[in-house]
Design a protein with these regions (language model features):
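Glycine-rich NAD(P)-binding loop of the Rossmann-fold in SDR/ketoreductase-type enzymes
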Residues: 18-29, 66, 70, 74-75, ...
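Glycine-rich Rossmann NAD(P)(H)-binding loop
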Residues: 100, 122-127, 155-163, 172-178, ...
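Flexible, glycine-rich beta-alpha linker
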Residues: 52, 91-109
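Active-site Tyr-X1-5-Lys
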Residues: 67-93
Length: 252
């Protein structure tokens, strides 16, 4: 069984009960059915939010204690716990934010800003954030499916290499379109503190905080990711640039 369905984090969604129903309870029922049917390997696509919030001061690894900070993350962690309790052999993949054709949400909106013709005041943003290209996710999934037995383990999954900062992403995308970066200097602190004062720090963390993921555990097991994030977003821009321009902003 490969369980990919779930309700991802949305800025405008505050109903914790809905996250619990879709992510936790549905997974619990599916795991119970899989155990009853004698399934030998249940692969669960969980989320990095089951382990951490939108920012971290160190590179995340599997040994870090799980400390979700919102309803979506808590529901994912509860689903993981229920899966283990079911007794079905399993592998849990905690995914960094995924990008690819048809993507939505905050990362899509950021990429939309990158493909716009406007100069962007992000030259001095030095935060580094890990992402996961859809092809790298599928590569990791195929690797786990081919394992001779279920690992009964958890793996963090992200693109390889040093994660890009916001300026890196803009440069990579605009270079893929044959354009200059057009990055303007900025006073980062003057952008951050008003959001903190308005208790909107999570929005800042989600776009501008550090969130580095170490996927070395699965790489050590033999997984070979296909490309880094700079290459991935450049390919996405070349193939789906027009679609990115139509992305709607995330809910506030």
């Amino acid at each position: 069984v490969i369980h990919l369905a779930g309700l991802e984090r949305k800025l405008g969604l505050r109903r914790s009960a809905l996250y619990d129903i879709v992510n936790h309870q549905a997974t619990t029922r599916l795991a119970a059915g899989a155990a009853q049917a004698g399934i030998r390997h249940f692969i669960y696509a969980s989320s990095l939010s089951a382990q951490n919030g939108s920012a971290a001061d160190h590179a995340l690894i599997e040994r870090d204690a799980a400390a979700p900070v919102d309803a979506q993350g808590r529901s994912k962690l509860a689903a993981e716990t229920a899966l283990r309790a079911s007794g079905v052999p399993s592998t849990i993949l905690r995914l960094a934010p995924v990008y690819g054709p048809g993507m939505a949400g905050g990362l899509a909106f950021l990429l939309r800003a990158a493909v716009s013709p406007l100069p962007l005041p992000v030259r001095d943003f030095t935060n580094r954030r890990s992402y996961l290209g859809i092809d790298n996710f599928l590569s990791a999934l195929n690797f786990v499916v081919a394992m001779p037995t279920a690992s009964n383990d958890v793996y963090l999954i992200a693109d390889p290499g040093i994660p890009p900062n916001m300026a890196d992403l803009i440069r990579a995308i605009r270079r893929a379109e044959g354009r200059r970066a057009l990055l303007l200097p900025s006073q980062v602190q003057y952008a951050e503190w008003p959001l903190r004062m308005m208790r909107l720090g999570d929005i800042w963390d989600r776009y501008c905080g550090n969130l580095r993921v170490d996927s070395g555990k699965l790489v050590a097991a033999g997984w070979q990711p296909l490309y880094d994030t700079r290459t991935g977003v450049a390919r996405l821009t070349q193939n789906s640039g027009a679609a990115l321009r139509r992305v709607t902003p995330p809910a506030a």
